[in-house]
């Protein structure tokens, strides 16, 4: 099985695939009498005209490392953000697209409390909490129509830390 | 100072003011080869035509109980959801409206990992993490125009557990 090494998750490294949702610098502004910093509009949410943003909750079972990546999926009609409610780190596998085929895979692991937003139509592995089960708020598209494409990997990848 | 007692946070009790975002029953469907339950579209997101949903991050200082509630605010152009990334419970004070004046105050305290969505134009206290500072993903309205009304309480309330 081919190996895929986990690399450091930075906003720059992840930018082609989506957005890192975390405190990454000073706040855009202080609110609530200076007791709270607002880091404004951190994710490129993107939905088709028939869709809208919604908040759902994924209650996901634990996975372990090394992790066998045997399938990726994408959502042509909308972006998808994952926001951990239990502080459980999760694996984020993504890939570029070549005429409908995922290529040049990358793997990242969030730190506790970090969220990510995956761009509309970007190939990604399914939610994979590492080491413990976890609840995740998910901001994605609510609406009619087919918003899921799956691609089973002919040769699975072994994702390692 | 008048006292306001914290009451149990249930979806029913909070419904007039917003939505409780948590695992509250069986999932709407199982996804990811049965390894994840999806609890679908849990929040009444509501934005005016010029606004859209965005994900921001609030980095808020700790508060303590009892808590002095001396101001509430509301957002006429959009709902506002708070999703804890560090598992820090937070105080949720809300009130009904009587011709622009907040009345009949209520106070709730989330459990670790619970989020809430506050309905558009509903009076509420500012984000108040209890016992520790915390980061919260906030799904609220991004757009032009005035979306904040504040109401300083003539007589503050002492919120107690």
Swiss-Prot record, chains A, B:
Q: Its Enzyme Commission number?
A: 4.3.2.3
Q: Which UniProt keywords apply?
A: Lyase, Purine metabolism
Which CDD domains does this chain map to? cupin_UAH
Per the record, the pathway is: Nitrogen metabolism; (S)-allantoin degradation
Biological process according to GO: allantoin catabolic process; purine nucleobase catabolic process
One Pfam family this sequence matches:
Ureidogly_lyase
Q: Which metal ions or organic cofactors does this protein require, according to UniProt?
A: Ni(2+)
Organism's domain of life?
Bacteria
Molecular function terms in GO for this entry? Answer: ureidoglycolate hydrolase activity; ureidoglycolate lyase activity
Reactions catalysed, as given in the entry: (S)-ureidoglycolate = urea + glyoxylate
Family label:
Belongs to the ureidoglycolate lyase family.
Cite the record's note on assembly. Homodimer.
Q: What does this protein do?
A: Catalyzes the catabolism of the allantoin degradation intermediate (S)-ureidoglycolate, generating urea and glyoxylate. Involved in the utilization of allantoin as nitrogen source.
Spell out the PANTHER family in the cross-references. Answer: UREIDOGLYCOLATE HYDROLASE, UREIDOGLYCOLATE LYASE
Q: What is this protein called?
A: Ureidoglycolate lyase
């Amino acid at each position: 099985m081919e190996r895929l090494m986990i690399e450091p998750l930075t906003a720059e490294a992840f930018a082609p695939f989506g957005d890192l949702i975390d405190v990454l610098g000073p706040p855009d502004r202080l609110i609530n009498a200076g007791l709270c910093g607002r880091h404004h509009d951190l994710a490129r949410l993107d939905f088709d005209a028939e869709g809208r943003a919604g908040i759902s909750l994924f209650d996901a079972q634990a996975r372990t490392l090394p992790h066998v990546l045997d399938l990726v999926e994408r959502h042509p009609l909308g972006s998808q953000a994952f926001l951990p409610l239990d502080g459980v780190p999760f694996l984020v596998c993504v890939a570029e697209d070549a005429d409908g085929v995922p290529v040049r895979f990358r793997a990242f692991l969030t730190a506790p409390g970090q969220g990510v937003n995956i761009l509309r139509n970007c190939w990604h592995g399914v939610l994979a909490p590492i080491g413990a089960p976890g609840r995740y708020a998910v901001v994605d598209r609510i609406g009619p129509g087919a918003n899921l494409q799956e691609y089973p990997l002919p040769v699975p990848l072994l994702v390692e830390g």
